[in-house]
Regions:
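Proline-aspartate-enriched helix->loop->beta-strand connector
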Residues: 59-63
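Active-site-adjacent beta-strand anchor residues
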Residues: 65-66, 86
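Short, glycine/polar-rich helix-capping loops at beta-to-alpha or helix-loop-helix junctions
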Residues: 68-75
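Non-catalytic interface/targeting segments
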Residues: 1-46, 50, 57-58, 78, ...
Length: 127
């Protein structure tokens, strides 16, 4: 299963991607092969780092979100996990998922006010 998560302002596919990762209230977890929502993780007081580690532990392939702070960026962008980060700000999760699968979203290469990585990105296209 190709796991793609979306950092959103609610639990439903129609809910918007949060403007900043730190503002998300939910992580929606999709099967990228079927585009079906398979799990919703509520923030419920979890820190950005805890959410990032949840994504790493589930071996997510991609995260659709807004800009990330350095601490969580370091987790999801680590060579060990190499979670591709797509900027889906301004879009509902379901639309952002389709756009990510069609390589129509920009990759987030750097954290907020920090130095990112060149990293490895899944099937990246420079269209």
């Amino acid at each position: 299963m190709l796991i793609i998560a979306a950092a959103t302002l609610g639990p439903d596919p129609e809910d918007m991607i949060a403007d900043l990762f730190e503002e998300c209230t939910h992580l929606q977890v999709y099967d990228g092969d079927t585009e079906k929502l398979v799990e919703v993780i509520e923030r419920n007081g979890k820190s950005d780092v805890q959410l990032g580690q949840i994504l790493a532990d589930m071996w997510a392939e991609a995260l659709i979100c807004g800009p990330l702070k350095q601490d969580v960026f370091d987790i999801v962008a680590a060579d060990e996990y190499s979670i591709t980060r797509y900027n889906g700000v301004g879009m509902p999760a379901a639309i952002a998922l389709k756009a990510a699968l069609e390589y129509k979203l920009d990759v987030i290469r750097d954290p907020i006010d920090g130095i990112g990585c060149m990293g490895h990105f899944i099937d990246q296209h420079d269209d």
